[in-house]
């Protein structure tokens, strides 16, 4: 019996021998594709190649691609655990042809691998083709020799694939495995096809058409092939099991969960859910996703919390999910070495998320259980779903999971209405910023010369005027704002976090002031205003970058690379860049880290960066193939799209990253690096802001001026200033304590005097009074003192603090059956525009109308008498 790891290797080795380039799995975060939450198929990393927008050095490829289907259009989350073949994470084995081989070879490869290499019996395989694809049908029936009795033609719904409403598309051919007549279900294309007897294991897509806007299909000049075979499904077939959760990959994970829970029934849904979810969660975190409340991070949080809830069902009340990382690493680490490297980081993320959710899970489940008991029908109300989501962090699919187990449904319309109300409450006025060139389409290319020089000659290739919209023009005149596209330029276009250059474009008839530079496709777009004369398309231009703006930007960009490397050295390899801003006045770097960076760590990071600056390391760039760079250990950012050839930036042996930005020649050019701020920007994301060069020197000098002023005020030296300040703080704290003691003593004395004002009503001494000049703490102490003195009493005291009413009510324990402190304090609070609450014996409230306090307190005896009278009846 072959293991999943062996099957993965057999597949890739087979296609390597068929002259395919073996391409490593792309990240789970698709590069530059906002239409996808996650990579969900093997072809995703080749999408630009299939669309003809990217050219690679090879024309045939194969890969084992990590995929996630959870959230968005492709969402298997709700079915995971309940079926034999649904997963949030899976591996897609695929071979691809980019205008090289087509149907005959693709079909031949698939059949040979399945029947001759893997030795699957042909009589257990079933083949389908698109009903109109006679070419594929003839290859299968006439050349391969598939039996007509194990072959069917199907409609477009099952056997015609499209990338979208328009673009590349074509028929597909699917290969199914027959598990035998003892399993219910009929062959593909039959009325009984929904059964489990026949399992699709390989899909061969033949991209041979281009669908136009009108729906017309035109033949592609170079047809391509995209195939996909789920490793888990193949393993189930090869290991003789009908259920994916019985393959080796899952058996070992389920055994680990069983060991933690003590549950021996390995068919339990919860075991399967947890085993599936640990795979997707670990790989998402490895690929740089952190749990959060939006986008991909929220999908990860939903998966984690669903797993935790199923652990709760198994009796696992303490954090357990993170303990499954190690068995997963042992299972898949050989194929994906990054699992070993980032294991501790992943464990920390999962443990922290689990601890956070455990705080509210129990409480939320109790509320849901009570609401289910109170149901008048089989529908959980939308308000309940929203309350669990908003207050207790229950993703909707977690509530749906529980409903499914109880044979209940969800009022999703009511939930959406509650969500809409919340969004309306939270909606703030916003302005839409016009993005220059955001909707422009241009087929232009600019040669960038700015690595070597800040001046250059070029020719105007296109002009755009900014009116209500951006419009193409032949001429721009003085006072007009717009964009200039040159055939070559030294101006750096904003990318990789580095801001675009500023400067001037000077022609024989005009001067253009550049305020920013952006990239539109392959063109550099200069934004700004004509200051003198006019510019025309075709004019020769003298370009000059603002040196005072570019130079500090270069310093900051190089310092950002040093900072990134220093963070990974000090905090660990779990640090992953999440964003950056490289401007002329500062740099900003966002990175994954679960907690605030300690002050000692910040000093260590800063010292390390400055040590590398003093070392004056050479800053070198080299153009090389992407895979060569990755093999050399170059850091690449998840979610970034790179071409086949990349620019590698090296700073000695300390830092090596892919980068297209502008940099110093040696690290010593940076001069000085100073961290000025560290803060959190989202769950698991920290931000460091820093300055370099002259800006760093100015920051230090400003600090010196402040320190000297402080020393003067304290009448202390540099070395004694901190001690002197601590002494003053200690004195202040002691004086504040003494002040509070005196206030309490004064209030207690006043309380003794107040006790004589109490009037007895039906056996309870009632006192309502105002005490000025005290805080809530003193007021509470006075109420306690009066309760002790009056024996059987109801007391409410009020004061005014910063124009707000503070009320404290107290009722002795022997009277709480007749009157409640919460009711008493709320009665007074309503008179002064507020409300409050608390225990039957002690409650607190506030109010907005201090001028009504005295009148409100005067009403207390009558209110108490009414309460006692009604209670007696």
Curated annotation (Swiss-Prot):
The gene is alaS. Pfam families: DHHA1 (PF02272), tRNA-synt_2c (PF01411), tRNA_SAD (PF07973). This is Alanine--tRNA ligase. GO terms for molecular function: alanine-tRNA ligase activity; aminoacyl-tRNA deacylase activity; ATP binding; tRNA binding; zinc ion binding. Binds 1 zinc ion per subunit. It comes from Nitrosococcus oceani (strain ATCC 19707 / BCRC 17464 / JCM 30415 / NCIMB 11848 / C-107). Keywords: Aminoacyl-tRNA synthetase, ATP-binding, Cytoplasm, Ligase, Metal-binding, Nucleotide-binding, Protein biosynthesis, RNA-binding, tRNA-binding, Zinc. Belongs to the class-II aminoacyl-tRNA synthetase family. Gene3D superfamilies: 2.40.30.130, 3.10.310.40, 3.30.54.20, 6.10.250.550, Bira Bifunctional Protein, Domain 2, Threonyl-trna Synthetase, Chain A, domain 2.
